[in-house]
Amino acid sequence: MDEFHRYGKEDSSWQQCFLYPLFFQEDLYAISHDHYLDGSSSSEPMEHFSFNDQLSFLTVKRLIGRIREQNHSIGLFVNCDPNPLVDRNKSSYFESVLEGLTLVLEVPFSTRSKYSVQGIKEWKSFRSIHSIFPFLEEKFPHSNYILDTRIPYSIHPEFLVRTFRRWIQDAPSLHPLRSVLYEYRNSPENLQRSIIVAPRVNTRFFLFLWNHYVYECESILVPLLKRSFQSRSSSHGSFPERTLFDRKIKHIIRISHRNSLKSIWSLKDPKIHYVRYGERFIIAIKGTHLLVKKCRYYLPIFRQCYFHLWSEPYRVCSHQLSKNCSSFPGYSLRVRMKPLLVRTKMLGELFITDLITDEFYPIVPIVSIIGLLAREKFCDISGRPISKLAWTSLTDDDILDRFDRIWRNFFHYYSGSFGRDGLYRIKYILSLSCAKTLACKHKSTIRVVRKELGPELFKKSFSKEREFDSPAFSSKAVARSQRERIWHSDIPQINPLANSWQKIQDLKIKNLFDQ
């Protein structure tokens, strides 16, 4: 592998034309087998293999020979495992070949990330969840429409092979990829004619396919949006005179219809911003309703032309920020008008002017949070707390720590929202559910639990939101945080909650489209 990388640095074309011999290197499958064992031991307990069940490189080479046959009607990994009772998804041979295939395909793409695709060099990109909320806070007040959709993850295998073919010149190296993809597509558990490529499939192979697929989508979509709508994606502060300036220039461009007597007035400088989390992405547009309709019509055509995916235009939802709310991710996002008092002194006289500016206004979706807690059996659908029966076998400290961790996750995640008074209802539900769980465990009532354990136990468990603020900020900063937003970007706590909102939103969209 080191020799391959050394030749690849000298000549990048050599790296793309000679990938197929890597499939016959025993070191590659030794590394992939170790990766499979490490991943299995870290996530789920794996059955102990005997000495006869260890990986055989001779068997692996026989598997590669069957891959070269290119017969999709015959299963590639049937009766090739020494233990026929082991399922294909848990087979060490199948996973080792899959890991080796991923390692080989990652070689030509390891250096590609250093170079930007033509057309994205000037596009300001931030690839971290830390940048989502500051991005929304900066760009949303200067936008008036939102397009909400998601990246389709049901892909035909041949399309994925063609996307790799544009980057890899060694055609034989793509035969194993095609065989593995068709193997997944023809599996009994997959009833569709396509395969599912999504970040929630937590394997190295499918994560690599997802990252490559998203890279292809964004590398084509973003430059086209930039050229079509002439967006600059430039950052600018919330200057008060910006609103008045837009009002003055909006009559510069006049578009008249042939069959209509009305005229359409549009802005000369429309702007468009793109942000994605997981499978969902939103496009913030500053422009007219005609521009939004064009973009809604353009996205389905883009999917059909470039990715051969059929999607109806109604799957792209549009919202006007001044009237409707948009959910992303787990927040109810909208823009509200904020009065601003400006004092101007000219020639010894003081003038007071009232200006109206737009302000990013994220709201805590209390109803959705109660629905999430009801699904996890902390309360019923009306928000009435119930005991968590699944936790009654734990110790008292473990029960309190789990409830405390849930509350802190909610508090940290919604630290940047306005109107956090609704979170106290969530705190009440969690605290009372904790008390009922302890009472159910000790076969007593809430009053007896409070009397025996004391109120300090509940106070200690649900008072750490102040402990979070006090070490990092002064008393003045804590008081200022009540009226200003402070984003606590803690990825281990943000990701699970955001993924939960992602699943709920996907379920709502699916139910809406199935009606």
From Swiss-Prot:
Keyword field contains Nucleus: no
Lineage summary: Eukaryota, Viridiplantae, Streptophyta, Embryophyta, Tracheophyta
GO biological process per UniProt: mRNA processing; RNA splicing; tRNA processing
Compartments, record wording: Plastid, Chloroplast
UniProt-recorded name of the protein: Maturase K
Protein family: Belongs to the intron maturase 2 family. MatK subfamily.
GO cellular component term, pick one: chloroplast
UniProt function note: Usually encoded in the trnK tRNA gene intron. Probably assists in splicing its own and other chloroplast group II introns.
Pfam families for the chain: Intron_maturas2, MatK_N
Keyword Chloroplast among UniProt keywords: yes
Protein's organism: Cedrus deodara
Origin superkingdom: Eukaryota
Molecular function via GO: RNA binding
Main localization, broad class: plastid
Keywords, in A-Z order: Chloroplast, mRNA processing, Plastid, RNA-binding, tRNA processing
